[in-house]
């Protein structure tokens, strides 16, 4: 819920659950010493106002950072916090991190309520048959059949690509459709009328209200 809390923090996850999100999405990066942390960007300048590249620093260095009561969080902490109360989408930002993310998910018994998603087909292909996966994309064409070939359970198109034709095609291939990022309640309503199975939003409360 970045509209109310800083994205990719434990506070934002807790708030998302409290306001009724069915699934929480977080982004995964890895530190120099191999710790999986939550962050959309490799650099923390946008979120924590410090010019620090996560992949060049250790977790010991990162965990000391703080901004307005927020601190960087490890994926392990996020999985513990959610604990299966809702589903989780873990977006893998670097192709080489897929195996480490799955290993942690499995070690924490979270595989039943977690899906690993990525823009990178090679990540999804390597995870095939081991966990629920989804292909994220912002450019057509070909992504829906590619997701099917990769063994995905879902596709995550940029919302402008979630046309009626695309949604129907994905459903014919037995793929769920989750469109991103939809912060206008009326646009969310339109997408659900089109048949999408879910939308990623920064405003869970507003979207839920529009769908009542």
Per-region residue spans from a language model:
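Phosphate-group recognition and catalysis centered on beta-loop-alpha active-site segments
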Residues: 1-212
